């Protein structure tokens, strides 16, 4: 039996190494903006996504855009970059009911990963805002993966949303594979714990300074 690694095996090995390296980096990072940058860039590498957005839950009522990257459009907002042009927060509830029509909100409210092959063919969610933005930018948001950030206390503190997985050989936009979804979920779990710990440390530091 040949022990030679196939291209698939090499990719899986590289992704596992990337996950391990990310886990170490996430646990040691003290700057929350750098932490969010690391989450987005690593998740895009793991899934070969063209774009990614990290949302954070605010007061249990809305989702705040914390960072947004898109390689094709050369967009980098939030994190260590400018927050000026970030979209407004998304309400988790409208008129007392859960905002299940928006993918990111649905992921928070249900705690489940959502994998959509083509947003333009999907009728389960409201993509009118996405389509309007695409038309303005000359882009097509096709495949989409939304992963809730659930920490060690099972609290959902945000959502990692990735768009347009690309075939590494052809560059064509494809659906996110089951393996890509698993890698994103593994990273999201690490990221949620790291973000929770960092926010707690920042809150403790602010409280300490208030007593000085």
Predicted regions and their residues:
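Short, glycine/acidic-rich hinge or "gate" loops at secondary-structure transitions
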Residues: 55-58, 116, 123-125, 200-209
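Signal-transducing coupling segments at domain and membrane junctions
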Residues: 100-105, 112-113, 117-143, 166-175
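Regulatory loop-to-helix N-cap segments in sensory/regulatory domains
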Residues: 3-11, 135, 140, 155-157, ...
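Short regulatory alpha-helical segment in sensory/regulatory domains of signaling proteins that mediates
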Residues: 23-28, 39-48, 54-58, 95, ...
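GAF sensory/regulatory domain recognition
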Residues: 41, 53-98, 121-122, 160
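A short, aliphatic-rich beta-strand micro-motif
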Residues: 142-151, 158
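Signal-transmission linkers at sensory-effector interfaces
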Residues: 1-38, 44-46, 67-69, 186, ...
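Interdomain signal-transducing alpha-helices
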Residues: 43, 107, 111, 116, ...
